[in-house]
């Protein structure tokens, strides 16, 4: 008899979450790296009690050019799609990956981080849809805060002097492995992860690499 309450609760949750939703992401702004997918529920939909972070089996998920979509379940990546189009979420199937232009490297990362979960009674799941901006992010300015001491030596003319050098310019970058970015950098963001959150770190490493060369 100890299963009655859990069974009743599970049944009620299933009834509330059984209707299809549609997850999508509008064009991602150039200053945004990751954004949580929006759930579209029509005004005539009866699915008003569905859990916020539950994806109903049969839900549609749209992916646009320049985006990579991942589904995260209990903090672990279980689905990846970098191919533009519309897809149907089927909870009964094994994890899938549509690598698109990301290539074989994303397959290896996916094999490393994926993990399936099973629960009894309540759903016990937190499922989220995230979209990554995979376009090239341009016009990132950098510059040395202070002059860099540099020694100039030319033994042919007997030159050996110390000079100070400054440098500045722009660079671009893109997210080539969204799974690594999720697991090592952004994690479960509430709504979105902006490029300004890693801007200082990127500039510091970029200038440091220039100094070493």
What are these regions (language model features)?
Residues 1-212:
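N-terminal hydrophobic membrane-entry segments
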């Amino acid at each position: 008899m100890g299963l009655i309450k859990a069974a009743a609760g599970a049944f009620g949750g299933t009834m509330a979450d059984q209707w299809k939703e549609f997850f999508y992401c509008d064009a991602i702004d150039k200053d945004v790296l990751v954004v949580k997918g929006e759930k579209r529920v029509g005004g005539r939909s009866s699915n008003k009690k569905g859990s916020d972070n539950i994806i109903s089996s049969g839900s549609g998920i749209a992916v646009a050019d320049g985006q990579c979509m991942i589904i995260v379940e209990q903090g672990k990546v279980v689905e990846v799609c970098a191919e533009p189009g519309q897809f149907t979420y089927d909870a009964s199937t094994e994890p899938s990956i549509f690598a698109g232009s990301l290539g074989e490297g994303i397959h290896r990362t996916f094999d490393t981080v994926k993990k399936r979960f099973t629960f009894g009674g309540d759903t016990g799941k937190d499922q989220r849809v995230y979209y990554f901006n995979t376009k090239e992010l341009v016009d990132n300015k950098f510059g040395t805060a202070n002059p860099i001491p540099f020694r100039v030596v030319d033994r042919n003319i007997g030159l050996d002097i110390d000079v100070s050098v400054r440098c500045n310019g722009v660079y671009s970058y893109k997210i080539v492995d969204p799974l690594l970015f999720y697991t090592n950098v952004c994690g479960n963001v509430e709504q979105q992860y902006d490029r300004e959150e890693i801007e200082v770190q990127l500039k510091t490493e970029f200038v440091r690499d220039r100094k070493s060369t």
